[in-house]
Amino acid sequence: MDVLSEVLRVVRLSGAIHFCAEFTHPWALLSSPPERLAARLAPGSEVVIPFHIATEGTSWLSMGKAPPILIEAGDLIVFVNAPQHSHASELGLTPVPVADVFRPSEAITTMRYGGGGKVFRIVCGYLHSDQRFGPLLDAMPALFRVRMRDSVLQLDAFTNSEKHAEPVSLDQGARWWSAAIDHLVTETAKPGPGNRAVLARLSELLFMEILRWQLTYFSAGHRGWLAGLNDPHVGRALSLLHAAPAEPWTVEDLAEGAGVSRATLAKRFLELVGETPMQYLAGWRMQLARRELRDSTLGLAEISARVGYASEAAFNRAFRRHVGVPPASWRQANAASIASRPANQKAARISTTSDQRH
């Protein structure tokens, strides 16, 4: 079982380009607080992950207690768990809230701001999902920076206070990564047929590759869901749970399948994933249930059986315990929320204007 693919199938991240920006020195902007991003960019979403692609010039990004991060042309920066941060042409400038100088638009517009000096240009986008899968997102660092240097990819991961790990350099994949970044930037500037879908898929593809890099290169020595996937025994237990989530699993069953003792699996699972196997299973079943409630017309009894509950009553109790409301109420409220969204927020959220210069 490819657990990461299964999670991404259920969570369904969608990509979008928000705007292009042309900043001229001196300039300094303060990002919106993370808790306000969904309402500002993708109402109805539980997750919003902004990203920037620098296309010209340099800038400085300041985040939490981490040392300032230099951003250069060609860099991709992904703010997975980043706190509110500032972005400026040089250190020491007082930032202005970005919400004060730019309003979200249904079209890709070019935001121009600054004092008329040296130019810094970026493409700003985001990924969003109507379901938050905490074990995956909580295992990620605050920020990723991916850059090309002499035809080699350099990957950096940062927490709010330091680098997450030593940088990783990769020869493999550098060519396609560079081509994907170039295509996304070109498509933003000169949109062709299917522009909305092309930009969404490219954004998603780049983020998925970052997830794979995190799993391969940055999870060793750290705790979290991705580290659990890399562990031979916990990873096997996760594969079993995701392959058959409706099965009446016990820790003993999982330990036998993983080839370790019950005590060893329980201890290792809790250390890496942050919860017990049965707590994790209950949470994943709720992810599946919410997807069925949102996307299907199945009755509660059938959904209950599909996600592993012996009765509708047991499912109702579990859903209320995890989500806070009964499943029928959640389904009704979610349907009303989707119906009330603007048309451009019900699918990919990208369109174009005549002002595409950047």
Predicted feature locations:
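Short helix-to-turn junction characteristic of helix-turn-helix DNA-binding domains
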Residues: 54, 241-244, 292-293
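An amphipathic alpha-helical interaction segment
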Residues: 123-133, 139-145, 149-239
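Generic protein-terminus/edge-of-domain signal
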Residues: 1-69, 75, 84-111
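A short, N-terminal "cap"/entry segment at the start of jelly-roll beta-barrel domains
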Residues: 1-30, 142-172, 340-357
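…primarily DNA-binding HTH/wHTH and HhH modules…
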Residues: 291, 298-302, 306, 311-358
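Basic/polar phosphate-binding segments, predominantly the helix-turn-helix DNA-binding elements
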Residues: 205-215, 236-287, 304-329
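Double-stranded beta-helix
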Residues: 90-120, 131-145
